[in-house]
Amino acid sequence: MTNSFQNSRRDLRERAFQALFNIEMGAELLAASQFAYGYDKVTGEDAQVLELPIFLLSLVTGVNNHKEELDNLISTHLKKGWSLERLTLTDKTLLRLGLFEIKYFDETPDRVALNEIIEVAKKYSDETSAKFINGLLSQYVSGAPSANKS
């Protein structure tokens, strides 16, 4: 059984978001990644033998390993009076994922990573959140001073 998911980078970013969200809910990294990647691709015993794409694993393990650093970067770009705790889990996860790819994936142009995470945000969050994520990540990409440092 398959659906419209392919192994395109956009689809793998979406799968990475799903895995990271599940990890936040207590799932183990590899199990969350395998589930996010394969839940609608195969059924039964075949589900245990799916080989996960390197890009997907790199995103999930990278965000997981750099979570504290990413959260600190996000916090420095929040407007005065806002805190990381005030953000929804969906928005935090999207920000972490987008920021990680922008910061650590040299082969992906910053604007491409930014636009791709906005597309995922539009699917899993609302328009206001997508604009917020766009603004914060655009500020990071442009090297603008942090909003709460003024």
UniProtKB/Swiss-Prot annotation:
Name under which the protein is recorded: Transcription antitermination protein NusB
Any one cellular-component term (Gene Ontology): cytosol
Q: Does the keyword RNA-binding apply?
A: yes
Q: Which GO terms describe its molecular function?
A: RNA binding
The family annotation for this protein states: Belongs to the NusB family.
Q: Which NCBIfam families match?
A: nusB, PRK00202.1-1
Keyword set includes RNA-binding: yes
PANTHER family linked to this entry: ANTITERMINATION NUSB DOMAIN-CONTAINING PROTEIN, N UTILIZATION SUBSTANCE PROTEIN B-RELATED
Q: Which GO terms describe its biological process?
A: DNA-templated transcription termination; transcription antitermination
SUPFAM superfamilies, from UniProt?
NusB-like (SSF48013)
Keywords on this record?
A: RNA-binding, Transcription, Transcription antitermination, Transcription regulation
Q: Which organism is it from?
A: Streptococcus pyogenes serotype M1
User: What exactly does this protein do?
Assistant: Involved in transcription antitermination. Required for transcription of ribosomal RNA (rRNA) genes. Binds specifically to the boxA antiterminator sequence of the ribosomal RNA (rrn) operons.
InterPro entries referenced in this protein's UniProt entry, alphabetically: NusB-like_sf, NusB_fam, NusB_RsmB_TIM44
